[in-house]
């Protein structure tokens, strides 16, 4: 038979047990303690779970149920009302958000608040109404205030006045923007009248063909009037250029040549000639300064 050895060491007449036996005993004790703790926690949870059905604080209906604990706190159980589709916590405030609403939004940021000025027409109403009377009736039905109706009538009158003054606008109810004509004109078709744009014309002007006599009288008036025509001067022949009448308009005699830029020896002329050349140079200050510089260099 096999002999069972003692799991201990004998040293100097004393038995020293192995440490493995002690570790197994400690692990068994820890497991037992953990089991007792988990059992106690489960008992506490089952005891604190609300079994009583609480009425909804909003609609006072009893169709409520317990959902979960808020933030894993046993003192804040979260309930749900099936009637009004709202959540609330016992001891907290009620959330006014239905299921699937997602993130809460401000009332002012709702898309309907931006379009309060848009009026929606009633259903099953007339599809086409071209007369002004029908439009005024519809507007009076929509707006209960008489001041608004008066404003609409005034706008209609203004729109009619604008169309008579020449602005292209749609007839009927007043539009917020005037209708401008297209940039490119419409090409006329066969047997199709084309409306021409209003042109300011004098009352005496007549449409149609004009006689040639009127054109001749206009040409004679233009000839008799004081119209300056520039004269061309031929420079091929210096004698003809000297005899032309342009020199007289400038105040220079035809007999004497223009000596504005002459040398010092030729400048010594009579006083009359000096005054004439000085007048010409004074008329052109740039030429005067150039002539002075030229004389200084000489």
Swiss-Prot record:
One of its GO terms (biological process) is negative regulation of DNA-templated transcription. It is found in: Nucleus. A zinc finger (Dof-type) spans 54-108. It comes from the Eukaryota. GO terms for cellular component: nucleus. Residues 27-46, 200-231 are annotated as: Disordered. Zn(2+) binds at residues 56, 59, 81, 84. It holds the Pfam family Zn_ribbon_Dof. This is Cyclic dof factor 1. It comes from Arabidopsis thaliana (Mouse-ear cress). The lineage of its organism: Eukaryota, Viridiplantae, Streptophyta, Embryophyta, Tracheophyta.
